[in-house]
């Protein structure tokens, strides 16, 4: 069972050889699904076609690699002028709290400069985003297109 309490943020250690890449190179639906299951992110991992379409339609996909292994993904939609939305941030559990998520967020912020970066968090990730300087807002609504 997943702990739903807010966890205190702890300063991470760091991975020495972390490479950030932009784009879909090295990715496949199976590779993404494996990371998302392990992270865990609730996404359509059992529907490879839909999962791949999500990535192809994204404005920005950043991947983090360590020794040739995929250890993190950030996926963003943006209008390029006002808002960017961080759809996904997934980090391999074995390297969480080692600076991978922070490095991905730093790179997203560089590439989405001049826009407000919005995201949905969970109770577990709230401390991470607060530590990075994100502010919780109450005036947001979520609807689902049917």
Residue spans of the language-model regions?
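A conserved beta-strand-loop-helix scaffold within acyl/acetyltransferase catalytic domains
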Residues: 50-89
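Conserved GNAT acetyl-CoA-binding A-motif
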Residues: 110-123
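Conserved acetyl-CoA-binding loop-helix of GNAT-fold acetyltransferases
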Residues: 91, 97-110
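Hydrophobic adenine-recognition pocket in adenosine-nucleotide-binding enzymes
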Residues: 89-91, 125
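Short amphipathic alpha-helix that is part of the acyltransferase structural core
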Residues: 2-48, 140
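Conserved catalytic-core motifs of GNAT/GCN5-like acyltransferases
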Residues: 3-8, 118-120, 130, 135-146
